[in-house]
Design a protein with these regions (language model features):
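Alpha-helical subdomain
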Residues: 1-39, 43-226
């Protein structure tokens, strides 16, 4: 991963640990629903299968990605939890309300939305529509967790940021980078959309929380693009 950009491995460790903790706690609290937006090859429904209990889990992604994921799971003889529902979806084109309703999603239930590694590949309109769906179609107290890419002016001096962005634009030409957000504007961005900011886990916070060793030193520098 570090050939992609320095600190990428450390970033994925920290981001995964952060979201793992949120999902695990939600399951322990028996949250009614968890929705993974752009789930890709996420394995949390498998890794935390013993904690799922009454929770319904929806994984949204493109049909080809989900088909490939299910093939890989079958080849590895990994059982899919009964509570997990694969929902073929294109966040840039399909109506989330209709798509999720057809899959059994209930808008009157407390829900955790996990939107990991996705926003920067979506056009701003799709980001707006997804946040609007969450605001209008989830019970009070529902939570959405998402990461975002910082703006180009902010990248100067950020560890590995410019190299990572350049690499992503070069290697993944079929997935252009379309959405970014200034770090100091996150609270205002959400407030304008009537969403309360509960925690802003910046790179500095993630680094301190998950990469600090017992002697107080850091396990390594971390990519500071997201």
């Amino acid at each position: 991963l570090d050939t992609f950009s320095p600190g990428t491995y450390e970033y994925f460790i920290a981001r995964t640990a952060y979201l793992d903790a949120i999902v695990e706690q939600a399951l322990r609290d028996h949250i009614p629903q968890i929705v993974f937006l752009g789930a890709g090859y996420d394995t949390r429904a498998l890794r935390f299968a013993d904690l799922i209990g009454p929770t319904r889990i929806f994984e949204l992604d493109s049909e080809p990605t989900q088909a490939h994921k299910r093939t890989l799971l079958a080849q590895a003889d990994v059982s899919i939890p009964v509570a997990l529902r694969f929902v073929p979806t294109d966040l840039t084109q399909q109506d989330l309300k209709e798509t999720l309703a057809q899959a059994g999603y209930a808008s009157d239930l407390h829900t955790l939305f996990v939107w990991e590694g996705v926003t920067y590949y979506l056009p701003p309109r799709a980001v707006e529509e997804t946040l609007a769906f969450v605001r209008e179609n989830a019970a009070a107290g529902s939570v959405i967790c998402f990461d975002y890419m910082i703006t180009i002016p902010e990248m100067a001096g950020r560890y590995g940021a410019q190299q990572a962005r350049d690499t992503m634009r070069t290697l993944y030409t079929d997935e252009p980078l379309l959405f970014d957000l200034a770090e100091d504007q996150v609270a205002a961005f959400l407030a304008e959309r009537e969403i309360d900011l509960l925690e802003h886990a910046t790179a500095d916070k993630l680094r301190e929380r998950y990469l600090t060793l017992r002697d107080g030193s850091l396990a390594g520098p971390m990519l500071d693009l997201f």
